[in-house]
A protein has these predicted regions:
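Mature catalytic core of soluble alpha/beta enzymes
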Residues: 1-279
């Protein structure tokens, strides 16, 4: 059984393996309903485009006061800071102000003239409080989508689904006793899919500039920013990461694309592998 809904700025497809002895349509539909609900909650909590999201509150007020946040938001921020440290700053989701100035993100609070800090300025206070010692503009789009996929899989399992997959616009996780053929978009022709093998019990995420550089918007800046020099990164090729958890696969694609290093030291820490499709 396969169902699809528009979420996370893309289409989220949930697939349940119908060959399991425990499979029933009622159980599958209920599990899928629950999985879509948790994915929608991630979007509600961490969406940059929503001025009422918890993330928008962090961006607006964390430098003024300590804020209590949802445990999932805290978990994603904790993972983001861990990757920031292990990648020596190459992953930094605090580049939101740069993306606002480029017109790639909405300007909710007229922040274009404010000097913002980086992820090192964000302070996490267990169990679930955050503050920042400088104004900050976090964009969790490069990690929260993968987290949402992981939560979807976790929810399917908790509701009796033994095998299946969750795919959020190319952020894919497969679980159970099935394998799924993997295809990556051609960096020169996004309508062409390039097969790269089969995935079993794991995740893959990819990044490329094939959409931001379509014929209609050739003048648009890249949405990938190098945090070390705050320049928009222009690159050819498609960059994919395989990892056990989709949250880490999602985030590490940015490290790969910026570093151009398929053996970056932080990949081993997250049991991740890198694949590049050249233009």
């Amino acid at each position: 059984m396969i169902r699809c809904k528009p979420l996370l700025g893309t289409y989220v497809e949930i697939s349940v393996n119908e060959t399991s002895p425990q499979y029933s349509e009622r159980i599958a539909n209920h599990a899928m309903d629950q999985a879509f609900e948790v994915i929608e909650l991630v979007q509600k909590l961490m969406g940059f485009h929503n001025p009422d999201s918890e993330l928008s509150s962090i961006n607006a007020r964390s430098h003024i006061e300590t804020l209590e946040v949802h445990e999932w938001t805290f978990k994603v921020l904790s993972a983001a800071k861990e990757i920031h440290t292990l990648s020596a700053g190459l992953f930094d989701c605090a580049v939101g102000a740069k993306l606002i100035r480029a017109g790639l993100l909405p300007n909710h609070k007229n922040t274009q003239t404010i000097e913002c800090g980086d992820l090192s300025n964000l302070i996490l206070i267990k169990p679930n409080k955050v503050r920042s010692d400088k104004p900050i503009q976090l964009d969790l789009g490069g990690i929260a989508k993968g987290f949402a996929v992981d939560k979807g899989v976790e929810t399917l399992k908790a509701n009796g689904i033994e095998s299946g997959s969750v795919n959020a616009g190319g952020d894919l996780r497969v679980f159970g006793n099935i394998s799924k053929e993997i295809q990556v978009r051609s960096p020169t022709n996004p309508n062409e899919l390039i097969p790269i093998g089969a995935l079993e019990e794991g995740s893959i995420a990819s990044t490329g500039l094939y959409y931001s550089k379509s014929r209609d918007d050739m003048n648009k800046l890249s949405y990938i920013v190098n945090p070390l020099n705050m320049e928009h990164v222009e690159f050819n090729g498609s960059y994919s990461i395989l990892a056990p958890k989709c949250m880490y696969a999602d985030a590490l694609t940015k490290v790969f694309a910026i570093s151009q290093n398929d053996s970056h030291p932080c990949f081993e820490h997250f049991s991740a592998q890198a694949i590049k499709i050249t233009a």
